[in-house]
Amino acid sequence: LHMKWFVLLLLTVAVLPAQGQKIRVIAFGAHPDDCDIRSAGTAALFAQMGNAVEFVSVTNGDAGHQVLHGKELAERRLREAKESARRLGIEYQVLTNHDGELLPSPEVRKQIIRLIREWKADIVLAPRPNDYHPDPRYTGVLVQDAAYMVVVPSVVPEVPALHKIPVFLYYDDGFQWLNPLRPDIAVRLDDVIDKKIDALDSHVSQFYEWLPWVAGKLETVPKDPSERKAWLKIQRTPAIKPDVRASLVKWYGAEKGNSAQYYEAFEICEYGAQPDDHRIRELFPMLR
Protein backbone atom coordinates (compact mmCIF):
# COMPACT_ATOMS: atom_id res chain seq x y z
CA LEU A 1 0.00 0.00 0.00
CA HIS A 2 2.78 2.42 0.91
CA MET A 3 4.53 1.77 -2.41
CA LYS A 4 1.29 2.48 -4.28
CA TRP A 5 0.99 5.92 -2.68
CA PHE A 6 4.67 6.62 -3.31
CA VAL A 7 4.24 5.92 -7.02
CA LEU A 8 1.13 8.12 -7.17
CA LEU A 9 3.11 10.93 -5.57
CA LEU A 10 5.87 10.59 -8.15
CA LEU A 11 3.32 10.76 -10.96
CA THR A 12 1.49 13.81 -9.65
CA VAL A 13 4.56 15.97 -9.11
CA ALA A 14 5.77 17.39 -12.41
CA VAL A 15 9.50 17.90 -12.73
CA LEU A 16 10.18 21.63 -12.79
CA PRO A 17 13.59 23.19 -13.35
CA ALA A 18 14.82 25.54 -10.68
CA GLN A 19 14.38 29.26 -11.31
CA GLY A 20 16.68 30.36 -14.13
CA GLN A 21 17.71 26.84 -15.14
CA LYS A 22 17.21 25.40 -18.60
CA ILE A 23 14.26 23.17 -19.37
CA ARG A 24 15.69 19.87 -20.57
CA VAL A 25 13.81 18.02 -23.30
CA ILE A 26 14.67 14.62 -24.80
CA ALA A 27 12.74 13.29 -27.79
CA PHE A 28 12.81 9.69 -29.01
CA GLY A 29 12.08 8.48 -32.52
CA ALA A 30 12.60 5.15 -34.22
CA HIS A 31 14.60 6.53 -37.16
CA PRO A 32 16.81 9.55 -37.92
CA ASP A 33 14.04 11.94 -39.08
CA ASP A 34 11.14 10.75 -36.91
CA CYS A 35 11.72 13.26 -34.10
CA ASP A 36 12.05 16.01 -36.69
CA ILE A 37 8.68 15.20 -38.26
CA ARG A 38 6.82 15.26 -34.95
CA SER A 39 8.63 17.88 -32.89
CA ALA A 40 11.25 19.93 -34.78
CA GLY A 41 9.18 23.10 -34.50
CA THR A 42 8.72 22.73 -30.76
CA ALA A 43 12.42 21.88 -30.43
CA ALA A 44 13.32 25.06 -32.33
CA LEU A 45 11.20 27.14 -29.96
CA PHE A 46 12.74 25.55 -26.88
CA ALA A 47 16.25 26.08 -28.29
CA GLN A 48 15.57 29.71 -29.22
CA MET A 49 14.54 30.35 -25.61
CA GLY A 50 17.85 28.96 -24.33
CA ASN A 51 16.68 25.50 -23.30
CA ALA A 52 18.36 22.13 -23.94
CA VAL A 53 16.93 19.66 -26.47
CA GLU A 54 18.23 16.28 -27.59
CA PHE A 55 16.77 14.10 -30.33
CA VAL A 56 17.47 10.35 -30.14
CA SER A 57 16.97 7.91 -32.99
CA VAL A 58 16.63 4.45 -31.45
CA THR A 59 17.74 2.74 -34.69
CA ASN A 60 20.41 3.78 -37.16
CA GLY A 61 18.04 3.84 -40.13
CA ASP A 62 20.12 1.40 -42.17
CA ALA A 63 17.16 -0.10 -44.09
CA GLY A 64 15.18 2.94 -45.25
CA HIS A 65 16.31 3.49 -48.84
CA GLN A 66 15.70 2.02 -52.27
CA VAL A 67 19.39 1.99 -53.31
CA LEU A 68 21.64 2.40 -50.27
CA HIS A 69 21.79 -0.20 -47.51
CA GLY A 70 23.62 -1.12 -44.33
CA LYS A 71 26.67 0.80 -43.16
CA GLU A 72 26.70 3.22 -46.09
CA LEU A 73 23.10 4.25 -45.47
CA ALA A 74 23.55 4.43 -41.69
CA GLU A 75 26.52 6.77 -42.11
CA ARG A 76 24.60 9.00 -44.50
CA ARG A 77 21.63 9.20 -42.16
CA LEU A 78 23.89 10.05 -39.23
CA ARG A 79 25.32 12.96 -41.22
CA GLU A 80 21.80 14.11 -42.06
CA ALA A 81 20.76 13.95 -38.40
CA LYS A 82 23.79 15.98 -37.33
CA GLU A 83 22.98 18.61 -39.97
CA SER A 84 19.40 18.80 -38.73
CA ALA A 85 20.70 19.30 -35.19
CA ARG A 86 22.97 22.11 -36.39
CA ARG A 87 20.07 23.86 -38.09
CA LEU A 88 17.84 23.55 -35.02
CA GLY A 89 20.50 24.34 -32.42
CA ILE A 90 20.03 21.03 -30.55
CA GLU A 91 21.80 17.72 -29.91
CA TYR A 92 21.12 14.53 -31.90
CA GLN A 93 22.10 10.96 -31.01
CA VAL A 94 21.66 7.98 -33.32
CA LEU A 95 21.87 4.56 -31.65
CA THR A 96 23.28 1.51 -33.43
CA ASN A 97 20.21 -0.76 -33.30
CA HIS A 98 19.30 -1.96 -36.80
CA ASP A 99 16.38 -0.49 -38.71
CA GLY A 100 13.44 -2.88 -38.98
CA GLU A 101 14.72 -5.14 -36.20
CA LEU A 102 13.87 -3.16 -33.07
CA LEU A 103 12.31 -5.11 -30.20
CA PRO A 104 11.27 -3.92 -26.70
CA SER A 105 14.08 -5.87 -25.07
CA PRO A 106 15.57 -5.20 -21.62
CA GLU A 107 18.83 -4.22 -23.31
CA VAL A 108 17.28 -1.45 -25.39
CA ARG A 109 15.10 -0.37 -22.47
CA LYS A 110 18.28 0.16 -20.47
CA GLN A 111 19.64 2.34 -23.28
CA ILE A 112 16.51 4.50 -23.02
CA ILE A 113 16.69 4.71 -19.22
CA ARG A 114 20.36 5.68 -19.40
CA LEU A 115 19.74 8.43 -21.94
CA ILE A 116 16.82 9.97 -20.02
CA ARG A 117 18.90 10.01 -16.83
CA GLU A 118 22.04 11.35 -18.47
CA TRP A 119 20.03 14.18 -20.05
CA LYS A 120 18.33 14.88 -16.68
CA ALA A 121 15.12 15.27 -18.63
CA ASP A 122 12.21 17.42 -17.53
CA ILE A 123 10.17 16.43 -20.61
CA VAL A 124 10.33 13.18 -22.61
CA LEU A 125 8.71 12.96 -26.06
CA ALA A 126 7.96 9.67 -27.81
CA PRO A 127 5.58 7.99 -30.27
CA ARG A 128 2.44 6.23 -29.15
CA PRO A 129 2.77 2.42 -29.36
CA ASN A 130 0.24 2.10 -32.20
CA ASP A 131 2.19 2.87 -35.38
CA TYR A 132 1.92 0.80 -38.56
CA HIS A 133 5.72 0.35 -38.51
CA PRO A 134 7.13 -1.93 -35.79
CA ASP A 135 10.10 0.33 -35.02
CA PRO A 136 8.07 3.39 -33.90
CA ARG A 137 5.56 1.08 -32.24
CA TYR A 138 8.27 -0.54 -30.13
CA THR A 139 9.98 2.80 -29.51
CA GLY A 140 6.74 3.86 -27.84
CA VAL A 141 6.69 0.68 -25.75
CA LEU A 142 10.33 1.09 -24.77
CA VAL A 143 9.85 4.66 -23.57
CA GLN A 144 6.68 3.70 -21.69
CA ASP A 145 8.56 0.85 -20.02
CA ALA A 146 11.36 3.24 -19.02
CA ALA A 147 9.03 5.86 -17.51
CA TYR A 148 8.93 4.49 -13.98
CA MET A 149 12.34 2.82 -14.11
CA VAL A 150 14.20 6.14 -14.44
CA VAL A 151 13.69 6.64 -10.67
CA VAL A 152 14.65 3.09 -9.62
CA PRO A 153 18.32 3.19 -8.47
CA SER A 154 18.97 -0.55 -8.87
CA VAL A 155 18.10 -0.44 -12.58
CA VAL A 156 21.05 0.80 -14.68
CA PRO A 157 22.89 1.53 -11.41
CA GLU A 158 25.91 3.06 -13.15
CA VAL A 159 23.84 6.19 -13.94
CA PRO A 160 22.26 8.04 -10.99
CA ALA A 161 18.48 7.65 -10.90
CA LEU A 162 16.30 10.71 -11.32
CA HIS A 163 14.59 12.00 -8.18
CA LYS A 164 11.25 12.54 -9.93
CA ILE A 165 9.56 11.06 -12.98
CA PRO A 166 9.59 13.52 -15.91
CA VAL A 167 6.55 14.55 -17.91
CA PHE A 168 6.15 12.03 -20.74
CA LEU A 169 4.32 13.18 -23.87
CA TYR A 170 3.12 11.38 -26.99
CA TYR A 171 3.55 12.87 -30.47
CA ASP A 172 0.54 13.60 -32.63
CA ASP A 173 0.38 10.85 -35.25
CA GLY A 174 -2.98 10.83 -37.03
CA PHE A 175 -3.79 7.23 -36.11
CA GLN A 176 -7.34 6.50 -34.95
CA TRP A 177 -6.88 2.99 -33.51
CA LEU A 178 -7.17 2.27 -30.65
CA ASN A 179 -8.09 5.91 -30.12
CA PRO A 180 -7.14 9.24 -31.68
CA LEU A 181 -4.55 11.40 -29.96
CA ARG A 182 -5.87 13.83 -27.35
CA PRO A 183 -4.09 17.18 -27.99
CA ASP A 184 -3.46 18.20 -24.37
CA ILE A 185 -0.77 20.61 -25.54
CA ALA A 186 -0.72 22.33 -28.93
CA VAL A 187 2.29 24.45 -29.88
CA ARG A 188 1.89 27.25 -32.44
CA LEU A 189 4.65 27.01 -35.04
CA ASP A 190 3.95 30.01 -37.26
CA ASP A 191 7.19 31.76 -36.22
CA VAL A 192 9.39 28.68 -36.74
CA ILE A 193 7.74 26.67 -39.51
CA ASP A 194 10.52 27.50 -41.97
CA LYS A 195 13.09 26.35 -39.42
CA LYS A 196 11.21 23.06 -39.06
CA ILE A 197 11.13 22.56 -42.83
CA ASP A 198 14.84 23.44 -42.93
CA ALA A 199 15.48 20.64 -40.43
CA LEU A 200 13.43 18.15 -42.46
CA ASP A 201 15.29 19.28 -45.57
CA SER A 202 18.50 17.95 -43.96
CA HIS A 203 17.20 14.40 -44.36
CA VAL A 204 17.64 14.27 -48.14
CA SER A 205 17.72 10.48 -48.27
CA GLN A 206 14.26 10.31 -46.74
CA PHE A 207 12.12 13.23 -47.88
CA TYR A 208 13.46 13.54 -51.42
CA GLU A 209 14.41 9.92 -52.16
CA TRP A 210 13.09 7.03 -50.04
CA LEU A 211 9.66 8.23 -48.90
CA PRO A 212 8.60 9.54 -52.34
CA TRP A 213 9.94 6.36 -53.95
CA VAL A 214 8.08 3.99 -51.63
CA ALA A 215 4.91 6.06 -52.17
CA GLY A 216 5.33 5.82 -55.95
CA LYS A 217 5.76 9.60 -56.28
CA LEU A 218 9.48 10.06 -56.82
CA GLU A 219 8.87 11.91 -60.09
CA THR A 220 6.97 14.65 -58.20
CA VAL A 221 10.04 15.78 -56.22
CA PRO A 222 11.38 19.09 -57.61
CA LYS A 223 15.04 19.30 -58.63
CA ASP A 224 15.55 22.92 -57.58
CA PRO A 225 16.48 23.23 -53.86
CA SER A 226 14.15 26.16 -53.14
CA GLU A 227 11.28 24.45 -54.94
CA ARG A 228 12.01 21.29 -52.95
CA LYS A 229 11.53 23.10 -49.66
CA ALA A 230 8.25 24.61 -50.81
CA TRP A 231 7.10 21.15 -51.93
CA LEU A 232 8.21 19.62 -48.62
CA LYS A 233 6.33 22.28 -46.67
CA ILE A 234 3.11 21.31 -48.42
CA GLN A 235 3.74 17.62 -47.71
CA ARG A 236 4.51 18.11 -44.01
CA THR A 237 2.06 20.73 -42.73
CA PRO A 238 -1.26 19.04 -41.91
CA ALA A 239 -4.54 20.89 -41.62
CA ILE A 240 -5.55 21.91 -38.12
CA LYS A 241 -8.30 19.67 -36.73
CA PRO A 242 -11.06 21.12 -34.51
CA ASP A 243 -9.70 19.57 -31.30
CA VAL A 244 -6.21 20.91 -32.04
CA ARG A 245 -7.67 24.35 -32.77
CA ALA A 246 -9.45 24.27 -29.41
CA SER A 247 -6.17 23.39 -27.70
CA LEU A 248 -4.37 26.25 -29.48
CA VAL A 249 -7.05 28.68 -28.32
CA LYS A 250 -6.76 27.35 -24.76
CA TRP A 251 -3.01 27.93 -24.61
CA TYR A 252 -2.62 31.05 -26.76
CA GLY A 253 -5.95 32.83 -26.45
CA ALA A 254 -8.56 33.38 -29.15
CA GLU A 255 -6.58 35.73 -31.38
CA LYS A 256 -3.34 33.77 -31.67
CA GLY A 257 -5.02 30.39 -31.35
CA ASN A 258 -7.53 30.98 -34.13
CA SER A 259 -4.96 32.56 -36.45
CA ALA A 260 -2.38 29.77 -36.11
CA GLN A 261 -1.58 28.00 -39.37
CA TYR A 262 1.01 25.46 -38.20
CA TYR A 263 1.26 23.35 -35.07
CA GLU A 264 2.62 20.35 -33.22
CA ALA A 265 0.46 18.62 -30.62
CA PHE A 266 1.19 16.29 -27.72
CA GLU A 267 -0.77 14.08 -25.34
CA ILE A 268 0.23 13.64 -21.71
CA CYS A 269 1.18 10.03 -21.00
CA GLU A 270 -0.35 8.70 -17.80
CA TYR A 271 2.87 6.83 -16.96
CA GLY A 272 4.77 10.08 -16.37
CA ALA A 273 4.27 13.08 -14.11
CA GLN A 274 0.82 14.66 -14.41
CA PRO A 275 1.26 18.44 -14.67
CA ASP A 276 -1.60 20.87 -14.17
CA ASP A 277 -2.08 23.81 -16.55
CA HIS A 278 0.14 26.12 -14.52
CA ARG A 279 3.02 23.65 -14.63
CA ILE A 280 2.52 23.01 -18.33
CA ARG A 281 2.99 26.74 -18.93
CA GLU A 282 6.17 26.65 -16.85
CA LEU A 283 7.51 23.71 -18.82
CA PHE A 284 6.36 25.17 -22.17
CA PRO A 285 7.17 28.89 -21.89
CA MET A 286 6.25 29.46 -25.54
CA LEU A 287 2.56 28.94 -24.68
CA ARG A 288 1.60 32.61 -24.48
Model region roles, listed by residue range:
Residues 65-68, 179-183:
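Short acidic, glycine/proline-rich loop/turn micro-motifs
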Residues 18-119, 141, 149:
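Active-site rim/loop-helix segments in enzyme catalytic domains that contact anionic ligands
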Residues 115-161:
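Active-site adenylate/phosphate-handling loop in enzymes that bind or generate adenylated species
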Residues 152-157, 162-164, 179, 185-288:
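C-terminal accessory domains and tails appended to enzymatic cores
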Residues 136, 141, 170, 185-187:
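Functional cores that coordinate and move charged inorganic groups
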Residues 1-2:
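Short, Lys/Arg-enriched N-terminal segments with co-localized hydrophobic residues
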Residues 5-14:
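Sec-dependent N-terminal signal peptides
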